[in-house]
Amino acid sequence: MATRRAFEILSQELTIEDKEKSERAKSIFSPALLQRLKDARKELDPKIQIDISIPQVYDANIKDIWITLGSPRAFDNNRQYELMQWMTLTIGVKAARQTDEEEKFSNYRGRVAKGLMDGAHFKVDVEIDADVEYKVSKPKSPDGNNDSVLMYDRGRRPLIISFETPYFEPADRMVAGRDEDDEPIMDWSWRIADIDQLLAKEALDERKAK
């Protein structure tokens, strides 16, 4: 239900300039995804209306969970850090001052342990089986005639939606505190970071081009 509502808000954001609705969209979608969709929107006639909806969701399954640990500065081609990657886990740690042969194991372990606590970010790819509806139309004319549909498509298909957390720096900021039952208090929300791996594919193409 929340995802269906998110697409309604996205449609409004891409069609109507409204400060309140814009703030709502920013709280639901990541800045990178929202900007990418807005850039694509600018290439179209500003008068057209865009409606993206998910009338029915039949099933949903977690596809992948991506975990990133370490300072976010480690992922900016920073030579002061080194990256360790395994499957969907990436860890950024301070680079060693010594070679692998010279560094003591205790120093290596301490370096990695500190890196784990410097920051944390989680992304979950969820594949949903749903009816997806797209509609691009011109607004109704002054005489009240029906809007002119320029493009329409509806069909049942798999849709991959990526949800992400904020980047917690340090990692323990993920938990704001504890309630009276000692349960963790979370003062953050998941955001939609990608749709059908749009940004992920573009990032991969960009890396291949280098």
Question: How should each PLM-predicted stretch be described?
Answer:
Residues 11, 22, 27-30, 53, ...:
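Generic serine detector
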Residues 56-140:
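A short hydrophobic beta-strand element
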Residues 107-210:
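Compact beta-sheet-dominated globular domain cores
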Residues 19-21, 26, 38, 42, ...:
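Context-gated lysine
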